[in-house]
A protein has these predicted regions:
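Cleavable N-terminal export/targeting peptides
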Residues: 1-35
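Short glycine/proline- and aromatic-enriched beta-strand/turn motifs that initiate or cap beta-hairpins
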Residues: 22-101, 136, 281-283
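Transmembrane beta-strands of outer-membrane beta-barrel proteins
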Residues: 40-44, 95-99, 155-159, 210-212, ...
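Surface-exposed extracellular loop regions of Gram-negative outer-membrane beta-barrel proteins
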Residues: 198-215
Length: 284
């Protein structure tokens, strides 16, 4: 009889303790850094620096061309950013990042020689150019350190840089009067190694930072190769003004240096976008 009473008591206590244990195991969801979902949208106002050198199939190296200084593209054009983070377990999370920026211009009267391989543009006649980029990044992170005040995480990611660029104008040499039309349309899949650190000053104020970097060489298929490196970094402050809505201010850097070989033509491209981001964040 005593054994039966003890057994019933034991299982009753065990059953009663389950909700408490379950609640305790998920206490991290109430931490300032413990949001299951966080979706952010911001306005990115970067300084833009885009350069290219094209080497033709004969090995003739063209001039270094700045899209902003030599071709007239805007050097400070804003765009939107989208961030989505999902913490599916306490120490495991996946993220998605997106931005796009399209620019075009027509210029004439350049003060420097502009050449694609051995083809030299007539700089006294109009030269049309465009540089469009769409970036998608997906990543996974694991929290090495995660408590009520701070989080240190590492992870891996893949940044898909969809590039489309072109320069069109009239040739001055070696074939005066002919039209030069040099374009590139390619997607650069650049993997990254990531590290980040977040710190909660209080329940409403958080410091957030993230760095992604990697250098890579890839064979993209017949007559197409890619090598390059990417730096993707940001740091800033998140203010959780309301229970599920916050506002953030951060500094963002995209620095990509890639060499494309497309049908024997080498495009060496370096683009550097850096500046402030202001946005709103929804968490739940």
């Amino acid at each position: 009889m005593k054994a039966s009473i003890l057994s019933v008591t034991f299982f009753a206590l065990l059953a009663a303790s389950q909700p408490v244990a379950a609640q305790s195991s998920n206490d991290w969801e109430n931490w300032p850094t413990g949001d299951r979902w966080r979706i952010g949208a911001g306005y990115f106002a970067p300084d833009l620096d885009t350069a290219i050198v094209v080497t033709d199939t004969g090995g003739n190296i063209g001039t270094g061309i700045s899209f902003e200084q030599n071709l007239g593209l805007d050097d400070s054009e804003g765009t939107g950013l989208l961030n989505i983070d999902w913490r599916f377990f306490k120490r495991h999370a996946v993220s998605y990042r997106y931005f796009a920026l399209d620019r075009s211009a027509t210029t004439s009267g350049s003060t420097v020689t502009i050449a694609i391989g051995d083809e030299v543009f007539d700089i006294d006649l109009p030269i049309q150019s465009f540089f469009d980029i769409t970036a998608h990044e997906v990543s996974y992170s694991y929290s090495l350190l995660f408590d009520q005040k701070k989080e240190l995480f590492v992870g891996v990611g893949l940044s898909l840089q969809d590039l489309s660029l072109g320069i069109q104008g009239t040739e001055s040499s070696p074939n005066p009067g002919e039209i030069i039309n040099s374009t590139l349309d390619s997607t650069a899949p650049l993997p990254t190694l990531n590290v980040g650190f977040d710190y909660a000053f209080s329940d409403k104020w958080l410091f957030q930072s993230r760095l992604g970097w990697l250098a890579v060489e890839l064979d993209l298929g017949a007559d197409e190769d890619l090598s390059g490196q990417i730096i993707n970094a940001n740091a800033g402050i998140l203010w959780k003004a309301f229970e599920n809505v916050g506002f953030f201010a951060q500094y963002q850097l995209f620095d990509v240096d890639v060499d494309f070989v497309d049908r024997g033509v080498l495009f060496a491209i370096d683009y550097d976008y850096k500046g402030p981001v202001l946005g709103v964040s929804v968490s739940f």
